[in-house]
Amino acid sequence: MRPLDDSPLARDGKVLILAYDHGLEHGPVDFEPRPATMDPETVFETATHDAVTATAVQKGVAEAFYPSYEDDVTLLAKVNGTSNLWMGEHDSAVNWSVDYAKELGADAIGF
């Protein structure tokens, strides 16, 4: 394991990840208390705050919004996902490759 200070997710020895990868897994019910957080643009704007060191998103959100923020936001690419829309075993399928995440500009990978 490499030291935290060598991680692209750390700043001054601290990490604060803005996790926006749960919408796929939990559905829109997670956003009901704060509807503005349903908008990825709002989340990426929030991610530009100095306290936020990275933003975790799924493939589609990264493709659509990260290019406009690549100079201001550290991307943690969540390469797998599941859903609570079915009962039984949750398959956490890989939905994009590490190589593609890197090509898009990801600084780190989440699984």
Language-model region placement:
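N-terminal basic/disordered segments at the start of proteins
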Residues: 1-12, 16
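Alpha/beta enzyme core
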Residues: 15-17, 21-55, 60-111
